[in-house]
Each structure stands twice: as structure tokens, then as C-alpha cells.
Amino acid sequence: MEVIPFTHLKDWLSAAEADALLAMLEARSDWTQGRIRMFGREIPEPRLTFFEGDPGLRYTYAHRSLEGQGWTPELEALRDRFARDFGIKTNTVLANLYRDGQDSMGWHRDDEPELGPDPLVVSLSLGATRDFDVRRDADRWTERFALGHGDLLLMGRESQTQWMHCLPKRLRVGDLRINLTFRQVLS
């Protein structure tokens, strides 16, 4: 049996909780399409994002810097629930809105210096079910998770140091997906 540092909790949120959170997030007006640097050139991100976190905390990825301005009550409640239920403390959330199956995220790891040497990531999925692939560095062994509405993925120790992950394009997916990725940024 393979032991991997990812735990998939299906239906972690009830359907009613997931529906209410999805509606609240869809209605936000601060979704932006950032620009990232890849392979020496600047391109639009193939998704929309927003960032929340403790005031003054900075998170930088792909030459894009984000600063925490505080929390909405709904996302703060989730942050507190992760600490209570799993003992995982987080102080930022990066939200990704994938408008349909054309929006994606390439292979990467969340290993920015401000996340520390072996970061944990708590990932909550809402909306359309999408494949989420993880690949181990040592032998390129790959696992696929079908992350659905209300599912939680805990990305544990070594998930960002020994593995990469991606959200591949899926042309048959016509509905949106929102993914909330909670992290602990070191101050």
C-alpha cells in the first residue's frame, strides 16, 4: 500500500454549508485575474483569485505579491474550524476561481520561503468536481483525486517538498469551481 501525504475528506462540508459558501464567494466583487511570470514572460493567470489573511502578512508566488487585509466572517470561521478539528493553524487563504474546464493550474508546489521548510496546505473545493493530480518526485508516481463540492484535501508533511500537484484542464467541465487554499505564512 502506498502511503502519501494527502488526505481526501469527501463531503467535509454538508451540501447546505457548501452551497451557502459557494454563493457567498461567487458574489464577491474582488476576484481578479492576476499576471504571473512563467518561463521568462508575463501571462494572465488561467483563473481568478482573491487573497485574505491576517493584516500585514505578505504571500508571494510567481512574482506576484499579496497582502492580508483581514478576514471575512465566513472564511475566519473555516480557519478556526481547521485549528479546532485538525490542529492546523493557518493565517492566510488564497482563493482560486476556475470559470470552467479551460481554467487550470500547472504542475507546481507551494514551497515559497514564507511558508517555511515543510508547509501544510488545507484545500477546500466548491462547485464542479475537478481532477487534482499529485506526483511524487522520486519516481514520478501519480495519484488522482476527484475533488467535489464540499470536499477537503489536507496536504500534509512532505506534500510540498517531495511532491508536485496540478489541476489539469478538463474540456467537458462547463461549471465553475472555487478552491480555498489555507496556509500558514511565517511573519
Task: Go through each PLM region and give its residues.
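Non-heme Fe(II) oxygenase metal-center motifs and adjacent flexible, charged/small-residue loops
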Residues: 1-187
